[in-house]
């Protein structure tokens, strides 16, 4: 399986997780790509809650990703701290959906 990051994901990742924390997240997704909760009306986007910097799940981050089963690929789209927001807006979801449709029509 391959994991691909969008530029915005990479930018937001810096300073939120250490390299080791990120490696553990990647391993988790490789072993359980369907772990994230499916976001209704998003075309298959998933949201995974992940602890960051020893704060536990309540102080962690939410990872938005898409699992392309046929291509055996996970596309990491967006990440945000839980104290930053609770959910994405419908406009943000539509923008992420367009990324998926553009990458894998």
Each language-model region and where it sits:
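Arg/Lys-rich, positively charged N-terminal/basic patches that mediate binding to nucleic acids
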Residues: 1-20
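Positively charged, low-complexity terminal tracts
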Residues: 1-3, 27-30
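A generic structural signal for short beta-strands and their flanking turns/coil linkers
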Residues: 5, 25, 42-46
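Amphipathic alpha-helical transducer elements in NTP-driven molecular machines
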Residues: 19-22, 58, 93
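Basic/aromatic recognition patch in beta-strand/loop cores that engages polyanionic ligands
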Residues: 38-76, 84
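Enriched for short, Lys/Arg-rich terminal
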Residues: 67-105
